[in-house]
């Protein structure tokens, strides 16, 4: 049944796209195709009086947008209604809204991985015809100013197993996150511990820092809940650096590679790191708990999004503001700096394909991914990982974000090997959730005799999940 469902969804998406190309559009709801025109037709007040609904994940990026919504409403005459939900149940709420096909949500906050499920299901409006339409896009928008690897990660051709970077532009970036080591520099200095550069160093440091500030304090914060979000930050970054991969295409099929020596060795190390240097509450740790513990001097180090630590370091953000510094990705034995890889996460704005207010929705996305807004959000809005080159190179940005100890330097060191290291496929969330369950079982139970046994069973489970995917090269 799965194969039939996927094929049908892809066909519906293709048909909808073909139909959208026929004829001009008089209003947002008449057709999927945005109206055509010239630059003289563009006016920020063109959709005055329209009301749009926006769904946000609770995050610094969305907090910055929300702060500027009154200015957007004044500039455009568009009324914005919004909700902001913690990540722990945000995507459940979003999925319910999108799957209803009611069009109640016009714009939503999402990540790059969601594209692989949402786009084939018909939940996303391709943005290319909006971006390239001078009647709908301000002449100063400058799409080419986006960092190519970041905006390209939100392009996909709807073919399972194919890498991102080709196909439609399904969303536009609010900010991107690479994953690396951050640490409390004051604590490490007081304890006489050097910043870990290798995986051996990291394990020794995490063990030595257990209980560094009393009962309940620990060496390193990493995510641990039984859901997909546990896999993509620190774990996947080290997984890729180790030389492992999740899937390969063989004879037109996706084949899971989690039983490789590299995958087993890396996972075995990760389990040991958590057991010997992690939190006793690791199984409940999300983005929020990891960052909060670093900022509260409960964790001495963290392997997570660079911005997660940044949000706890600017003035007044946490008890340890100003004491946090950044490093890169620890290197396994035999690896060099050139081998260091970091997995990308990209918070983005997307348009619901069922929206009845698509032009107004595009105005919202355009405004909150514009150079002007992103210069503000990257400096005064505490959204440090800007996706725009002009902002990243600006004196204002460097002057503010550059105050964070080794923040920009660590990003520069990892940027060339920052990528999405997962294989795009529509069962991504089912697979990574199963992966996280296995990881949690290895840490918290005696279900498996060894990491090797667990990973070999996981390989079998994931092969079954993706068995119906056929890839035509």
Model-based region annotation:
Residues 70-153, 186-197, 291-293, 297-301, ...:
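Extracytoplasmic "Venus flytrap"/periplasmic binding protein-like
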Residues 157-174, 179, 203-255, 271, ...:
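Extracytoplasmic/periplasmic solute-binding protein
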Residues 1-52, 74-75, 460-473:
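Short, low-complexity disordered leader/linker segments with a strong preference
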Residues 74-75, 79, 99-100, 167, ...:
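Extracytoplasmic/periplasmic substrate-recognition and gating elements
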Residues 340-342, 404-461:
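C-terminal capping/gating helix-and-loop segments adjacent to ligand/active sites or protein-protein/ligand interfaces
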